[in-house]
């Protein structure tokens, strides 16, 4: 974590007073579960807190920037900005994916590149930063890391894998593509969905995500990787 602390200070001028908070923010549940005897804390509670402060800050930004937009339009914009694919992108932008501690099984299954894990990590970091430095420092970090991309709209550049999969399969004839939720796990504030995509009633691939739509996109992405 020494390298992470140096990076945060160099890139963002952030020095954590409570190093345990930072360490917890970068500890996935899979790592904590594999080291239960050490009683290691994981980042789910910090994620919960970070999600709340991020919702507030983005809501405030949108409210100020778009004084003529209705509540429904503002909600849609906020959802686009704080969805897991966007937050995972910001985690990668900050280099956070290199520092998260994962269990061996999660690491082997590609967890370090999984949007749901990296999106949660970004929120957990914000939660830890809030507790250590206060909301103004979180606000400054969000303004530096996120808002420039929000202004340019680059946070929206997420591939629609479902459409790509549909176009690929239908280029070979009529097919029936179906997405089914096969598993739900996690606490109410951090649900994780597993979705299976099938073609003509034959299972093709699976995906996971913090929402059903995100899990469907992940399943379609995995299916495309298999077919192409």
Swiss-Prot record:
Its EC number is 3.1.26.3. It is an enzyme of class 3 (hydrolase). Mg(2+) binds at residues 47, 120, 123. It is found in: Cytoplasm. It catalyses: Endonucleolytic cleavage to 5'-phosphomonoester. It comes from the Bacteria. Signal peptide: none annotated. One of its GO terms (molecular function) is ribonuclease III activity. InterPro entries: dsRBD_dom, RNase_III, RNase_III_dom, RNase_III_sf. Its main location: cytoplasm. Residues 5-134 form the RNase III domain. The keyword Magnesium applies. Its cofactor is Mg(2+). One of its GO terms (biological process) is regulation of gene expression. Belongs to the ribonuclease III family. This is Ribonuclease 3. The lineage of its organism: Bacteria, Bacillati, Bacillota, Bacilli, Lactobacillales.
């Amino acid at each position: 974590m020494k390298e992470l602390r140096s990076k945060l200070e160099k890139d963002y001028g952030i020095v954590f007073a409570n190093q345990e908070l930072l360490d917890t923010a970068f500890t996935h549940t899979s790592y904590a579960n594999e080291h239960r005897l050490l009683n290691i804390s994981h980042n789910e509670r910090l994620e919960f807190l970070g999600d709340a402060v991020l919702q507030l800050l983005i809501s405030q930004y949108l409210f100020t920037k778009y004084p003529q937009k209705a509540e429904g339009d503002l909600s849609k914009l906020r959802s686009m900005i704080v969805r897991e694919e966007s937050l995972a992108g910001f985690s990668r932008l900050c280099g956070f994916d290199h520092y998260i501690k994962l269990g061996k099984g999660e690491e082997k299954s590609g967890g370090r590149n999984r949007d749901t894990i990296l999106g949660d990590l970004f929120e957990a970091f914000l939660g830890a930063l809030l507790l250590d430095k206060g909301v103004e420092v979180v606000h400054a970090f969000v303004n530096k890391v996120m808002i420039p991309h929000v202004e340019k709209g680059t946070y929206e550049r997420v591939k629609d894998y479902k459409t790509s999969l549909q176009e690929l399969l239908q280029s070979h004839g009529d097919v029936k593509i179906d997405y089914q939720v096969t598993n739900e796990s996690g606490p109410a504030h951090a649900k994780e969905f597993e979705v299976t995509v099938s073609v003509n009633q034959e299972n093709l691939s699976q995906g996971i995500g913090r929402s059903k739509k995100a899990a469907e996109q992940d399943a379609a992405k995995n299916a495309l990787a298999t077919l192409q």
